[in-house]
Amino acid sequence: MVSLGGFARKLFGSANDRRVRGYKGRVDAINALEAEMKALSDEALAAKTAEFRREIADGKSLDDILVPAFAVVREAARRVLGLRPFDVQLIGGMILHERAIAEMKTGEGKTLVATLPVYLNALAGKGVHVVTVNDYLAQRDAGMMGRIYGFLGMSTGVIVHGLSDEQRRDAYACDVTYATNNELGFDYLRDNMKYERSQMVQRGHFFAIVDEVDSILVDEARTPLIISGPLDDRSDLYNTINEFIPRLSPEDYEIDEKQRSANFSEDGTEKLENMLREAGLLKGESLYDIENVAIVHHVNNALKAHKLFTRDKDYIVRNGEIVIIDEFTGRMMPGRRYSEGQHQALEAKEKVQIQPENQTLASITFQNYFRMYDKLAGMTGTAATEAEEFGNIYGLEVLEVPTNLPIKRIDEDDEVYRTVGEKFKAIIEEIKSAHERGQPMLVGTTSIEKSELLAEMLKKDGFSKFQVLNARYHEQEAFIVAQAGVPGAITIATNMAGRGTDIQLGGNPDMRIQQELSDVEPGAERESREKAIREEVQVLKEKALAAGGLYVLATERHESRRIDNQLRGRSGRQGDPGRSKFYLSLQDDLMRIFGSDRMDGMLQKLGLKEGEAIVHPWINKALERAQKKVEARNFDIRKNLLKYDDVLNDQRKVIFEQRIELMDAESVTDTVTDMRNEVIEEVVAKRIPERAYAEKWDAEGLKADVQQYLNLDLPIVEWVAEEGIAEDDIRERITAAADQAAADRAERFGPEVMQYVERSVILQTLDHLWREHIVNLDHLRSVIGFRGYAQRDPLQEYKSEAFELFQALLGNLRQAVTAQLMRVELVREAPEEPQPLPPMQAHHIDPLTGEDDFAPAGDTLLAVAPTTRDPADPSTWGKVSRNEACPCGSGKKYKHCHGVYEA
């Protein structure tokens, strides 16, 4: 029976269908201009860019020129790349321009679609960012699509790892900039650690189109990008605690795989306390006494390292290092590290060198970074399942773009076996069958361990020609994926490895030409061989089509339906036939964690024998319900964490905006004076209670405060003893003395030097206090959840206390800046040999898995002093060479920075 809603959808179409139909008028208008555009010369077509810019300057909006601009890009793409955007691609481009997410199936040309709104919005002259998930895709897309922009008179830049500040600044200054999400976020953080506006590389956040938007804005949504500096070495402590865990019994701890948590039982805690006591690490009687907070953190990490993290699934050991495996893609991520000491615990477990921990200097999540853009849009093949999250958090609507040709892929019901062994036996038989008929196969696994297990099983069964695509071999992944459509090819891939590269039936002729003819010079021979390769690929394509197209066989379901849909979507591109099927067992992670006992009982009642499978739509629906529960839980976690992160984000925006104002201001003297006056107000109010008699005033305390903050030795005790003295009199005398001392110092220094000194001191002190503030908020966040036991809302408590900490930061800033500036004196030092400083590191932590992704900051502007030197406190610097980089972190030589004065 058809529901009323279903009947209405059939009669009127879905809301998505109606929205898509609404673009038809503009598509027709673009098509109507096609002949006119074709008639233009190359020069006349390129001149349209200047014409559009003049129209915008005269008051036209981007919407007003959308139709002719899209028509120009379509014609340019045809001339430059030989690609003409289809009508559905024009619709995708309009969706992106209108701040929405375009869901486009694999092979529908998302990269080309982006050129339409990118060109249109770049006409505004504010820069457009196209965001990809890795350097390879950023360079590939910028190289290919940049030809269109260049033909039309626009510049294209690309940001990848390892560029200098100057190269980054040039790339951001281009009309169009291709970059990875990591590089964009790190550049933003680095910019807000610079001490001069001219050192910054980004020029604003106008419009960003995020490719694979679900991966970046959902999978890594709450991933903090972190820039940090090293802390003291604690490797001995990690190694000592690591030895305790193997001495525990299973009843000494509780493991919850669903929540990814591990806790000690009462017996386990008692055993652990005895071990710690013997090692001299326990203070007091109980592990959970306040003085043992750090030790609790270490033992919990050690327990997780041994019981929650599995080698070759969560990480591998390579060249004496722990290398993280991405949960979603199965890729190795060199440089990514687990946070909060977890990585060090794993290093201790695997007996490799323990790298030092780091202190956070600056951080931001992708959620908050991308919400800074005036205009945001995204593309992906799978977004509909996360439409609620995109709408609630980013204000982005998800619209499905129709395929250019109907999808012919057949998605079969899952086959469920009782054990993993039975499942893999059936998979081997299915691979044999498909291989014999010449059907190309993509076999999806969820981990390196399982991909290599399957590879070993295939070898034992006599298979020699197959490709394994996982984290260990990611360097070759683009080529392997591109050739996975060759008849009879067997490609084993972890999750979405190779995402961004299409699997073309018969293989990818362009990649074959690039690889096979790399040494052949242009000419008749190369043209002949290129033609032969293309003809061979066409023959192979016909064979693959005859065999049924690409067969996607998945060996397990992921927690997210979206990841499963991504895998299915590799087959059936551009109207090709295809097939997809999932092989499952009750021992799979998803089935085991989310209640396979009931299903196992049901299968036994049905009399299911060994090696037999059950195939029924009910199974698919039950699994989908389990996945929906996981997705809803993960969404709630992300949504809740965002509420907490918004508190830090609001404060971060205030601090970063204040830094820019300080760098832009011609003079900060008024700011310094205001700070000094507020400090005077605070110390007077503290020592002279309101409406109190003079004998109740704390004259000695006030004298000490004035000495501490203003570096002035004033006869305050004598002033207080004067007949009829008032509080205002005391305040005015202190203010006058402080103003005079500041004026005398400014006269000695000269206005130019004084301006530089004042600005430098404020920025350095602000940065130092902000770093401490981040640590304080982290500590507050880690314990605030316990307020719920007292019937108090943890979020409201966090907001309230975070605000108090922020107010304290501002108060400390006023006091520290005032105290330092009132002590500044000019000095001259003899030159010494320069000493190099250790670089800072950039980190990328994934809260879903606890991963910490870092890369060397890569420029001297980000050098930090050794831990014995406090950048905000010159008294800790000791002897500094004139030619050494200044310990304050400005990036200048000491003789051009703090070398002109001394605190």
From Swiss-Prot:
SMART domains for this protein: SecA_DEAD, SecA_PP_bind
InterPro entries the record matches: Helicase_ATP-bd, P-loop_NTPase, SEC_C_motif, SecA, SecA_CS, SecA_DEAD, SecA_motor_DEAD, SecA_preprotein_X-link_dom
Compartmental location: Cell inner membrane; Cytoplasm
Cofactor binding mode and count: May bind 1 zinc ion per subunit.
General function of this protein: Part of the Sec protein translocase complex. Interacts with the SecYEG preprotein conducting channel. Has a central role in coupling the hydrolysis of ATP to the transfer of proteins into and across the cell membrane, serving both as a receptor for the preprotein-SecB complex and as an ATP-driven molecular motor driving the stepwise translocation of polypeptide chains across the membrane.
One Gene Ontology MF term: ATP binding
Record's bilayer topology term: Peripheral membrane protein
Name assigned to this protein: Protein translocase subunit SecA
Cofactor names: Zn(2+)
Binding, Zn(2+): 886, 888, 897-898
GO CC annotation: cell envelope Sec protein transport complex; cytosol; plasma membrane
Primary localisation category: membrane
Key words of the record: ATP-binding, Cell inner membrane, Cell membrane, Cytoplasm, Membrane, Metal-binding, Nucleotide-binding, Protein transport, Translocase, Translocation, Transport, Zinc
Assembly with partners or alone: Monomer and homodimer. Part of the essential Sec protein translocation apparatus which comprises SecA, SecYEG and auxiliary proteins SecDF-YajC and YidC.
Matching CDD domains: DEXDc_SecA, SF2_C_secA
Organism: Sinorhizobium medicae (strain WSM419)
Similarity field: Belongs to the SecA family.
